[in-house]
Amino acid sequence: MADSKLILVTGATGYVGGRLVPRLLEAGHRVRCLARDPRRLEGFPWHDQVEVVGGDALVINSLDEAMQGVSTAYYLIHGKQGGMRDAQRDLAVARNFAASAERARIERIIYLGELVDPTSDLSPYLRSRHETGYLLRYSRVPVTELRAGMIVGSGSALFEMIRYLTEREPVLICPAWFFSRAQPIA
């Protein structure tokens, strides 16, 4: 018998979240999605099977409302550009998320982080992803942290960028970052 506890998914409009939600529904879970713009969820075939809470994870009241009655919360939020401003925003969101999860007595947070060596010279984006995991892990709510390198699949930003370039350019001059070591997940 499927567990009918309520699960919160943040980042449901993203690549991973958009694929996670239907799997949770297929497993018999009730799903709530927090979205800054709830209309963006209307494009997903499962949108009428989930509860949608409009709000911003930077706003404590939005998180508190979204977490009421939830047993597990998926943290799939991240700054897309990766600059210092996004890094600071990510950390503020993580603090808010952890505090709200504690108040709501969430049983578990599941966080999708990045596979990094924290002793290396990290970009602001990677540093903030690592620190976000740290902030969540040291809250009073148990955390399962999944760490991935690049996630590549049809529809992912990286896949679409590579497809776009290879369809239009017969020869590419590769920038320095192209030669960085990576462990992609397909």
Segments predicted by a language model, with ranges:
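N-terminal Rossmann NAD(P)H-binding glycine-rich loop of SDR-like oxidoreductase domains
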Residues: 2-29
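SDR active-site strand-loop-helix element
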Residues: 10, 34, 76, 109-115, ...
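Rossmann-fold NAD(P)-dependent oxidoreductase module
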Residues: 19-23, 100, 135
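Conserved glycine-rich Rossmann-like NAD(P)H-binding loop of the short-chain dehydrogenase/reductase
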Residues: 29-36
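NAD(P)H-binding glycine-rich loop region in Rossmannoid oxidoreductase-like domains
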Residues: 39-104, 114-119
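A short helix->loop->beta-strand "cap" motif at the edges of active sites that frequently abuts
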Residues: 103-108, 140-141
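Active-site Tyr-X1-5-Lys
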Residues: 121-149, 154-164
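A conserved pocket-lining segment of Rossmann-fold NAD(P)-dependent short-chain dehydrogenase/reductase
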Residues: 164-185
